[in-house]
């Protein structure tokens, strides 16, 4: 009987860990802004406008002009956590 409980606890723990790890990854993902103009990052206040668009229109907590490793140009990206 103890072996059955240990197996159940291990299975539930593994499922919780799996759910947390996949949820955090999707929550930290940086997404190209759909509402910000493509040339916004070339302007003096580009980061501020990018953050405002991400916050008010797309409901993300943060937004910033970034060059991601897969891209070669500066674009506005939205994301939830600053530490991602």
UniProtKB/Swiss-Prot annotation:
Main location: secreted
Cysteine disulfide links: 28-84, 41-65, 50-76, 54-78
Subcellular location field: Secreted
Keyword Secreted attributed: yes
Keyword Disulfide bond carried by entry: yes
Entry's Gene Ontology BP terms: defense response to fungus; killing of cells of another organism
One of the record's GO cellular component terms: extracellular region
Keywords assigned: Antimicrobial, Disulfide bond, Fungicide, Plant defense, Secreted, Signal
Signal peptide: 1-26
Similarity annotation: Belongs to the DEFL family.
Name of the featured protein: Putative defensin-like protein 38
Natural source organism: Arabidopsis thaliana
């Amino acid at each position: 009987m103890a072996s059955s409980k240990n197996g159940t606890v291990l299975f539930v723990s593994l499922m919780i860990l799996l759910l947390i790890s996949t949820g955090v990854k999707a929550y930290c993902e940086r997404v190209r802004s759909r509402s910000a103009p493509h040339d916004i990052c070339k302007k003096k206040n580009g980061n501020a406008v990018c953050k405002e668009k991400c916050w008010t229109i797309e409901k993300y907590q943060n937004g910033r002009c970034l060059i991601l490793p897969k891209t070669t140009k500066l674009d506005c990206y939205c994301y939830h956590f600053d530490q991602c």
